[in-house]
A protein has these predicted regions:
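A conserved beta-strand element that flanks and buttresses the S-adenosyl-L-methionine
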Residues: 192
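A short His-aromatic
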Residues: 198-200
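Class I (Rossmann-like) S-adenosyl-L-methionine-dependent methyltransferase catalytic domain
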Residues: 2-41, 49, 63-71, 76-117, ...
C-alpha cells in the first residue's frame, strides 16, 4: 500500500497498553511458564472456585463474544478475572486491536467513494469495533453485520444504540458464502473481518474472502488481522480454556487473502506484537 505514512498518521494520537521491561521479564521467566505448565485440572478448579467469568465464558464458547467483551471492558468483578484481564498479554492485545482497528476502519469509511459508505462486517458478534468506527467516522456510514450465530446481536444492538449508531446497523445471521446476494442491499465499500481468521482453516479464510471479493468494487479495502504466538500462553488457552486458535504471520495471512483476490497490503502491529491489523484491497 503506497500511503503507509498517511495511515501511520491516522494513529499518532492513540494510546496503547504496553508491558514495562520488568513486567515483560517476569512474564517470560515466571508467569507464563506457571500458567502453561501447572496441572490444567488444578487451574480449572481454582478458576471455578474464584467464580471467574472469563473462564466460564470460554468454557461455554471458546473465544466467543462474551469473553471478548470481558476483555474489552477491562473492568471485571472477580479477582481472578482482574489478574487475567489486566495482566494477560492476550486481553491487553485485544484492547489494543480494538483501538487500532476502530481508528483504521473509521478512516477507511471517510475515504470511501460514496456517502453514506456501506461497511460489511463478517463474524461480527456484537460488532463492537464496527460500531466504534461508525461513531468515530466524520462521514456518514451504515453497517451490515453478519455472523453464523445470532446470540450476540441483542447486545450489539444495545451497544450501537448507546453509541448513537443504533439506526445504522443491521445484524444478519447466515453464511456469507452462500447467501451474500440476499444479505446485501448494496455492495460493501469497506469489509471488516477482524477476530475471525484465527478460528478458521486456510480453506475457510480463502472461501469467505473470495465470496466477499466478488461483490466488492475494484480497489475497495478489507480490514483483517493475523494472530502471532507473542502472547505466550497458547498452551494455557488450549489446556485450561479449551481455546484452539490458528496462529499465522501477517505474511501468511496476506498470502491467503491474495488467493482470494486481495493485494496492496499494509500491516500494522499493535504494540504487544500479538495482532497485526492488515489493510488489503481488491485487485482490479
Amino acid at each position: 500500500m503506497r500511503n503507509g505514512d498517511e495511515v501511520q498518521g491516522w494513529l499518532s494520537d492513540l494510546e496503547f497498553e504496553r508491558f514495562g521491561t520488568v513486567r515483560r521479564l517476569l512474564k517470560k521467566v515466571l508467569i507464563n511458564p506457571l500458567a502453561n505448565y501447572m496441572p490444567a485440572g488444578l487451574m480449572r478448579a481454582v478458576l471455578r472456585l474464584t467464580e471467574s467469568e472469563l473462564a466460564a465464558a470460554n468454557w461455554a464458547d471458546p473465544g466467543g463474544w462474551r469473553s471478548m467483551v470481558i476483555s474489552y471492558d477491562g473492568n471485571p468483578r472477580q479477582i481472578a478475572d482482574k489478574l487475567l484481564v489486566h495482566g494477560g498479554a492476550m486481553p491487553m492485545a485485544l484492547r489494543n486491536r480494538r483501538r487500532l482497528a476502530a481508528r483504521l476502519l473509521a478512516r477507511l469509511i471517510e475515504r470511501a467513494p460514496v456517502e453514506p459508505a456501506h461497511v460489511l462486517s463478517l463474524g461480527a458478534g456484537p460488532g463492537i469495533i464496527t460500531t466504534d468506527a461508525l461513531a468515530q467516522a466524520r462521514r456518514k456510514a451504515y453497517a451490515t453485520l453478519v455472523d453464523l450465530n445470532a446470540d450476540a446481536f441483542e447486545y450489539g444492538r444495545e451497544y450501537a444504540r448507546r453509541a448513537g449508531a443504533g439506526n445504522r446497523v443491521r445484524f444478519l445471521a447466515g453464511d456469507i458464502r452462500t447467501h451474500i446476494h440476499e444479505m446485501l442491499d448494496h455492495p460493501p465499500d469497506v469489509v471488516e473481518m477482524l477476530g475471525i481468521c484465527e478460528y478458521l482453516t486456510d480453506e475457510q479464510v480463502v472461501s469467505i474472502a473470495s465470496a466477499v471479493n466478488r461483490v466488492m468494487a475494484g480497489g475497495a479495502p478489507a480490514l483483517f488481522n493475523s494472530l502471532s504466538m507473542a502472547h505466550g500462553n497458547d498452551r494455557f488457552f488450549r489446556r485450561v480454556f479449551g481455546l484452539h486458535m490458528n496462529h499465522r504471520s501477517a505474511r501468511e495471512l496476506q498470502a491467503l487473502m491474495g488467493q482470494a483476490g486481495f493485494g496492496d497490503f499494509l500491516s500494522i502491529p499493535e504494540p504487544l506484537g500479538v495482532y497485526h491489523v492488515i489493510i488489503g484491497r481488491k485487485g482490479g
